[in-house]
Amino acid sequence: MKTFSAKSHEVKRDWFVVDADNKVLGRLASEIARRLRGKHKPEFTPHVDTGDYIVVVNASKMVVTGNKGLDKKYYRHSGYPGGIYETNFDKMQARFPGRALEKAVKGMLPKGPLGYAMIKKMKIYAGADHPHEAQQPKPLDINVKAAS
C-alpha cells in the first residue's frame, strides 16, 4: 500500500465558527492552530495546507488565568535605536481585541510561506457578528477550561 500524500488542489476546506467568550487564550489558540494546520484530518500532509477556515467571534471576551493580564508582556520595535515598545495583555485586549490570539496562534504555526497561508484562514472579530454567513460556517465547540 502506498503512502497517501494530499495535493493542494484536492483538499476540501470547511468553515467553522468559534465563540471565544470566557475561553482561555492558550488553550483556545492551540486548538485553533491544530485546525488551521489540518492535523485533525486523516489526510494531513506536513508540506501541504490541509486546514480549515476558522472564524473567531467574541475575541474581546477572551481571558487569561492568574495574573497574566498584567504580567504577560508583548514587545514590538520601531527599528530605531531605543524604539522598543512594551504592553501587557489587558491593554492589548482593550485596544486591539483579538491581536493577542492572533500572535499566539501565529507562534504555533510553521514559519515561512506555508504558515503565512495558514494564518490567513483565521478571521477574528471582537463582537458576535461576522461577515462570513455566506460560507455557512458550522459551530465548533472547543471544550477548553473556562477561567474560574
Swiss-Prot record:
Keyword tags: Ribonucleoprotein, Ribosomal protein
A Pfam family per the record: Ribosomal_L13
Protein name in UniProt: Large ribosomal subunit protein uL13
Family: Belongs to the universal ribosomal protein uL13 family.
One BP annotation, GO: negative regulation of translation
Record-annotated disulphide pairs: none
Record HAMAP family: Ribosomal_uL13
Function of the molecule: This protein is one of the early assembly proteins of the 50S ribosomal subunit, although it is not seen to bind rRNA by itself. It is important during the early stages of 50S assembly.
Residue ranges of the TM segments: none
Protein's UniProt keywords contain Aminoacyl-tRNA synthetase: no
GO molecular function: mRNA binding; structural constituent of ribosome
Assembly and binders: Part of the 50S ribosomal subunit.
InterPro entries assigned: Ribosomal_uL13, Ribosomal_uL13_bac-type, Ribosomal_uL13_sf
GO annotation, cellular component aspect: cytosolic large ribosomal subunit
KW Ribosomal protein (keyword) present: yes
